[in-house]
Amino acid sequence: MHEMIFPCGLSHQRSSADNAPLPRLMVAMFHGLLATPDVSPATLERFAAGYGLSCLATPPDEGYWLAWRAGVLGLESPHHGAVTADFVGGAARHRREFGGGAGQPVARAIGLKGSQRPQVVDATAGLGRDAFVMASLGCRVTLVERSPVAAALLDDALARARLDPATHEIAARMQLVFADAADWLAQQPAGSVDVVYLDPMFPDTGKSAAAKKEMQAFQVVVGDDLDAGRLLLVARQVAGKRVVVKRPRLGALLTGEKPAGQQVGKSTRFDLYAPLPPASA
């Protein structure tokens, strides 16, 4: 096992078989990183090398690629607008300023009370929205993401957040780890983290309202978390206080096991699982 530390707090940790595909497979045609005037050669090379991505000179006619526009990295396609991770403006800013503080459901779910600020591992980081909320409430959050596309978007978003006066202290509490979360958690000592947070993506059943085209594209490229049951088991063996699983309000349980408790909101539900003894050697 080896670990490489990149700028912006990125910790890249992979098994010795670094060239092996990750369990979360990209299910759409993703081409790589597009060189644009908005990115320096050094930054392009760092992202390409850090995430195993090819560099492109021209945009493809079809499929998906990553590109910087006006200093922001986005997932692009001919068929929709860019998908970006952003912790500075837009929805992140609104939620930071008006999201309800410690009274919002995700805060209650992770056990935020009074001065208690649990250490959290967001093991399915995605675009980092919930992780940023937890960090904005004072928690130290490790974002673990195995998709090279999602991890690259997060890396870029964290870099921008660290440069903005309104968010740099929040972003300083966030560390990005590019790894398979189940493998990474299995290497951590039992009880070394207070809370493990899971928000796995699953195939669209057609029963929920249609997501925006951009988010549909993100899920198509990143892929579904079909091994989330294994991740839950490992998470319960590592968490010192609880594991939180975010689900649609009426969604099925992640596994057949009933949670120890639940926090139910208007559209989402947080299933709370107690820690388990670590697996025997």
Swiss-Prot record:
Gene3D superfamilies: Vaccinia Virus protein VP39 (3.40.50.150). Its main location: cytoplasm. Its EC number is 2.1.1.242. InterPro entries: 16SrRNA_methylTrfase_J, SAM-dependent_MTases_sf. SUPFAM superfamilies: S-adenosyl-L-methionine-dependent methyltransferases. Keywords: Cytoplasm, Methyltransferase, rRNA processing, S-adenosyl-L-methionine, Transferase. It is found in: Cytoplasm. It is an enzyme of class 2 (transferase). CDD domains: AdoMet_MTases. One of its GO terms (molecular function) is rRNA (guanine-N2-)-methyltransferase activity. It comes from the Bacteria. S-adenosyl-L-methionine binds at R129, D130, E145, R146, D199. Belongs to the methyltransferase superfamily. RsmJ family. Specifically methylates the guanosine in position 1516 of 16S rRNA. This is Ribosomal RNA small subunit methyltransferase J. The gene is rsmJ.
